[in-house]
């Protein structure tokens, strides 16, 4: 597998709709001149933004978290330009960008150093060949203090790896349960 460059990312986004909306360069400031956490195309990846809808874990119902029988009441919905994650807690968000992953590509998501250096960890499982949708982002606040996530700014980086041959069975072929997700998507069993 080979990691793909900015040229390949731009070509696939602009000619094949792999990322929408797409930013061909790296954005560091708003049109008004305000600094933002960078997003857009980088040397060997694409920095994604998160939307304004968040789900924050709460212990109001004192439920046990079970991925096979998940209780949506374990979350509080938040909509806004920022999300404050309580100490040692967790939140979900989604990317503004919609992805269409080619059949011979696997995409890995890593957190941005700006957040990692503040104790905020981003976790996303790989975007498999022929998966498409908005990515549900998982944020963990590992600190003893509240942590802030900024909507419409960079939160994670996608790296694209191209195989030397297409996979035998893609995510679309097997009817993956998160295909076409749009917005924050909770666990499905």
Swiss-Prot record:
InterPro entries, per database record: dCTP_deaminase, dUTPase-like_sf, dUTPase_trimeric
Assigned EC number: 3.5.4.13
Ligand binding (dCTP): 112-117, 136-138, 157, 171, 181
Signal peptide: none
Enzyme class: hydrolase
Lineage top rank: taxon: Bacteria
Active site: 138
Descriptive protein name: dCTP deaminase
């Amino acid at each position: 597998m080979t990691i793909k460059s900015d040229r390949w990312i731009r070509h696939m986004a602009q000619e094949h709709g792999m990322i929408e909306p797409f930013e061909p360069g790296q954005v560091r400031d708003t049109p008004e001149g305000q600094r933002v956490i960078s997003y857009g195309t980088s040397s060997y990846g694409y920095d994604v933004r998160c939307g304004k809808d968040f789900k924050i874990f709460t212990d109001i119902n004192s439920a046990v978290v079970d991925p096979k029988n998940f209780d949506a009441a374990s979350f509080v919905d938040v909509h806004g330009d920022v999300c404050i994650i309580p100490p040692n807690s967790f939140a979900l968000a989604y990317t503004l960008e919609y992805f269409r992953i080619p059949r011979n590509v696997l995409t890995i998501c890593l957190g941005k150093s700006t957040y990692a250096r503040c104790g905020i960890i981003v976790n996303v499982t790989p975007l498999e060949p022929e998966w498409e949708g908005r990515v549900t982002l998982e944020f963990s606040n590992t600190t003893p203090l509240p942590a802030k996530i900024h909507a419409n700014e960079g939160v994670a980086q996608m790296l694209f790896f191209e195989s030397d041959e297409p996979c035998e069975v893609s995510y679309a072929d097997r009817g993956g349960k998160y295909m076409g997700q749009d917005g924050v998507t909770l666990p499905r069993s």
